[in-house]
Amino acid sequence: MASSDASAAGATSTYLVVYKDKTSTSGAGKAVSAAGGQLVATYAPISVVVARSASADFAVRMRAVKGVEGAVATTRFASAVDGGAVGADASATGDTTTDAPSVPANGVAGLNDSLSGLQWDMTQIKVGEAHAVSTGSPTVLVGDIDTGLDYTHPDLAPNVDAAASVNCVSGVPVAGVVAAMDDNGHGTHTAGTIAAAANGIGMVGVAPSVKIAGIKAGNAAGFFFPEAVVCSFMWAADHGVDVTNNSYFADPWLFNCRNDAEQRAIWTAERRAIKYAQSKGVLVVAAEGNQADDLSHPTVDATSPDDTTPVTRDISNACAVVPTEVPGVVGVSATGNKQMKSFYSSYGISEVDVAAPGGDSILQQTAAAPNGRVLSTWPASLLTSTCLPARRVIDASGAAYCYQQGTSMASPHAAGVAALIASVTGKTGGALSAALQDAVNPIPCPTDVSAYAFFPALDGGAAQTCEGTLTQNSWFGAGEIDALKAVG
């Protein structure tokens, strides 16, 4: 748990201060104050604190403190810490009518909600058949570390764990579903894929009987800054979360280079928080990314820092994407309805553990997936402002849904399958990870990758290539997840 020490009003920058591993942070308040800052949160189990300061030399002064191994400003966008009051606007805005696509008959492969005929992704990984065995257990809790979730959505409300939900955007946990309300849409989409209820409304999630907590780390603009990521994993560890879904990379650096002092501090703090969660039995599942980068052989980062003007720089394997490249994290690449790798999905022989449906609007449009994307829940209040008109779907009940694509959509399928496994076996942590990677259908590297020539890596422009064997390769890992195998 974090302790909130001050409101830090008027501060211009947020800082992570990383003490040497297992060093006491009991003197952090005095040290931060002496350096011209205010202590915002203390994460004693991992020897990390969050501070705010307007002093230009704050980081330099903190690095000189005995026991401190790193201090770094995490963003130029200071996030307000206001003593616990986090505003949320859940009011409807605008007209949500749309020319929705025609809906095939429901009841496809055992999925029986009103929009189930549009769920090609669930059919592909045999979710309906799996539900004949188990729909998950309400004793299993998935923490969706994302932009929050719309706890009022009728397809999510039955399964939301209000007490385990939290807003971590500022680096200080503010508990409750109101604080965790989604102001972007992304988190509501991933939450629906994991745990939308089988209630006759809209769609069905992979594990519609488990509980889900909205752990809000991403702000309205979709940034996931280090203090929020640290807070989120510490919260998950201490609040009974079994599986976390992580459909993001931690900003502002796509690749955090451990040979750079500032980026090393960010990597260290985030890695410690993830490791702490893993030590409590939490399985961490994460998206590989949408840059078509080979994460096992990185050479260029043209994306970072993304909170200002990116600067192209040469990188190596000393640089890693958080959270997907943190040891023990299950990395997920994306597939489309033809069970090919999605054109945008990043990959890597040492990085991808499993593949899951994320959609592909260019190479993999089919009769079942006419626009190639994945349908899931969306806040009605944000539908007209954050979901393009052609992607909007309104259920007969008035509930809102949106089509999206990305490894962000793939990861929650894997997290949901992990939740099913946990429900039927009681497995946690490493044992759960191994079981998830066994519940797959292997997909070999394609013999011809020319279809991907139009979309080289966004970082460096390298052509996409696949390496490895049938049972472990850089595009699909062990294979595409299979929910029926998971519960069989």
Task: List each language-model region with its residue ranges.
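C-terminal subdomain of the subtilisin-like protease fold in secreted/lumenal serine endopeptidases
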Residues: 39-41, 204, 240-248, 400-401, ...
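Catalytic-core regions built around general acid/base machinery
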Residues: 262-283, 318-328
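Short, surface-exposed ligand-recognition loops at beta-strand->loop->(often short) alpha-helix junctions
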Residues: 16-24
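Active-site core segment of subtilase-fold serine proteases
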Residues: 95, 100-211, 218, 223, ...
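Autoinhibitory propeptides
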Residues: 8, 29-116, 337-338
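Extracellular S/T/G-rich loop segment that most often corresponds to the catalytic His/Ser-adjacent loop
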Residues: 146, 282, 309-420, 480-485
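Secretory targeting and sorting signals
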Residues: 1-3
